[in-house]
From Swiss-Prot:
This is DNA primase DnaG. Mg(2+) 1 binds at residues 175, 217. Binds two Mg(2+) per subunit. The gene is dnaG. It catalyses: ssDNA + n NTP = ssDNA/pppN(pN)n-1 hybrid + (n-1) diphosphate. Forms a ternary complex with MCM helicase and DNA. Mg(2+) 2 binds at residues 217, 219. GO terms for molecular function: DNA-directed RNA polymerase activity; metal ion binding; poly(A) binding. Belongs to the archaeal DnaG primase family. Its cofactor is Mg(2+).
Length: 443
């Protein structure tokens, strides 16, 4: 169906009480609607002028009856289209057979087009956003291309290096080409790559002429290359990437931080690299002579200083030890005394009230509370107890068949010295208050 300028589509269903063919249906549509309306809505004239489209008929004959689905495109306005649709329902015969026609639906094709436009526009926008290159990405791409152009080759081994390698007073030795590019991204143009674990002769020679920093990965491979560099080159400073990271995978901020934190080679070489230094023809004569006296002086000074400190502060240390021992002894005695006091109070509690166990047995599994005022025992529900709590003062003893919570303690701490409950759930206990669980009393 060529929709063209179609605005609406009229879907019609026809049932004929006999066998008919397509041309019979189309003839009935044009023949039985002719003259019903004004000439402006005559189907033949409308079709000639293109106001309505080609009428499609899908026909099926079943058991002596004919069933047709008729589709009629219309570019008329909604009022004229509605009149035209209603006109089709006036058809009552097709060929020699009686027929009934019902309008199934009038579809506004523009709604479908709008929905299609919306979905398609959404899809196109998503594609544009995916394909759109951010300004930052463009900038970085241009910078990257310039940096790639800036990378040079040095020496007979064609080692990758930055453009300032010849003119700079200092150089940075890295592992590979990718590391040189990474440093170029950070604006560092005096790096040169070893390109392998075997240090080229060019690196050995240039390290003697310039202030040299070895900047290696923070992994086992980086450590091996560093050892190789220390054996063969005149290294002045050492810097490592963060532990477990490679130089090429390190951010600009981290690289700058690592290079600022570079340490002199004298500080790196100790027991760990002693055998390397001893076998290094470059470092053995110059560096070891510089490091060894300084190291011996530091160790000797530390030993002397330690002996002097021991002589000066030994009496004070001994006195302090005696004081600490006394404090520990006093704390132990205090703890023992507290334990005795608690045990004594438990004993007094049992004696004073003619068997506290019996009191607790009386309220166990009842949900009631029992308290003693002036030697008189009183039993209430907890709700009733709370109602009269303002009138109750100076209790000798309070027991409840419920857990003792912080709220209960805050409520009763100034009314009784002893509180007993099924269990104690308190985070902060007042100094003068004793808390016991049923199990502690019943033991």
């Amino acid at each position: 169906m060529d929709l063209g300028t179609t605005k609406y589509i009229i879907y019609t269903e026809l049932i004929a009480d006999g066998y008919v063919e397509k041309h019979d249906v189309i003839g009935a549509i044009f023949g039985q609607t002719e003259g019903l309306l004004s000439t402006e809505l005559d189907l033949r004239d409308l079709q000639k002028s293109g106001r309505i489209g080609r009428i499609d008929v899908e026909l099926e004959n079943v058991n002596g009856k004919s069933f047709a689905k008729i589709t009629l495109p219309s570019s008329l306005d909604k009022v004229e289209t509605s009149i035209l649709a209603a006109t089709l329902e006036t058809i009552d015969r097709v060929g020699p057979c009686f027929a009934t026609v019902k309008i199934a639906n009038v579809e506004d094709i523009r709604v479908s087009k709008r929905q299609y436009i919306t979905n398609r526009a959404r899809h196109i926008l998503r594609q544009l956003m995916d394909e759109m290159v951010d300004t930052y990405e463009i900038t970085e791409e241009i910078k990257e291309s310039l940096r790639t152009e800036e990378i040079m080759e040095y020496g007979p081994e064609n080692l990758p290096c930055g453009p300032n390698i010849l003119h700079s007073d200092s150089i940075i030795i890295v592992e590979g080409r990718a590391d040189v590019l990474t440093l170029l991204r950070c604006g560092i143009k005096n790096a040169i790559a070893v390109e392998g674990t075997s240090v080229p002769k060019t690196i050995m020679e240039i390290s003697k002429k310039k202030t040299t920093t070895a900047f290696t990965d923070g992994d086992r491979g980086g450590e091996l290359i560093l050892k190789e560099l220390l054996q063969t080159c005149d290294i002045d400073y050492v810097s490592r990437a963060p532990y477990g990271k490679e130089v090429e995978g390190t951010s600009k901020k981290e690289i700058m931080k690592c290079l600022r934190a570079k340490v002199p080679v004298e500080q790196i070489i100790g027991e760990k690299y002693k055998n390397i230094v001893e076998s290094n023809p470059v470092l053995n004569e110059e560096l070891v002579e510089k490091i060894t006296p300084k190291y011996i002086e530091e160790v000797t000074h530390s030993s002397k200083e330690k002996n002097e400190l021991e002589k000066t502060f030994k009496p004070e240390i001994e006195k302090e030890t005696v004081v600490i021992e006394k404090i520990k002894s006093f704390e132990k005695k205090t703890i023992d005394a507290d334990e005795k006091t608690i045990l004594q109070e438990n004993s007094n509690l049992e004696k004073k009230y003619n068997g506290v166990k019996e009191i607790l047995e009386g309220i166990k599994n009842t949900g009631l509370v029992k308290f003693v005022v002036d030697g008189k025992e009183k039993t209430n529900s907890f709700k009733e107890f709370l109602t009269n709590i303002q009138e109750i003062k100076n209790m000798d003893f309070f027991a409840a068949d419920m857990p003792i919570t912080q709220k209960i303690v805050d409520l009763l701490h100034d009314k009784t010295p002893i509180i007993v409950g099924t269990e104690i759930k308190v985070t902060k206990k007042p100094v003068n208050l004793r808390l016991f669980s049923f199990d502690e009393i019943m033991e």
